[in-house]
Amino acid sequence: MSPTHLPSAEYYASLPKHIAGAGAVIHDAAGRILLVQPSYRTDTWEIPGGGLDTGEHPLQAVRREVKEELGIDLTPGRLLAVDWVAEQADGRPPLVNYLFDGGLITQAEARTRIHLDPEELTAWQLATPEQWDSLLAPHMARRVHACSRAMTQGLTVYLQHGFDLTGRQT
């Protein structure tokens, strides 16, 4: 029996679907990371970023999202982590999130350069590693801790829902 080959359009339509996002890990010299509070979710904080638009690649998305959310023109640094999040019980498709080094910012620079989009964000802060677990959702806290290690150690890590599966944890 010979294998059946689908026409390209049918084959591509049959492949699994996922969504993608990109985030910026913006930090200061003391290791604090810039966190933002979404206007639509006041119980937790996040890092700047968001979903990729159709036809957009992750670097374009992180630049656009940081510009929209913070008013900052960002030139992202290296890729720190890729985080795969499986399909959720609420029906959200699988997510692949690309996390980039967003560079250094001082408290003084942040005060003058950050202009929040009030429709998206209500506040920002430079948070210490000790604050991350209480401010961030558990998967986001794991993600930020992993990105901090990746920056310090010069690594890129692979995560699954924030868990580092590269075996390089310290």
Predicted regions and their residues:
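Acidic, metal-coordinating catalytic segment for phosphate/diphosphate chemistry
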Residues: M1-G23
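A generic fold-level signal
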Residues: K17-I19, D28, R92, E119
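Unchanged
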Residues: L52-T75, W84-M140
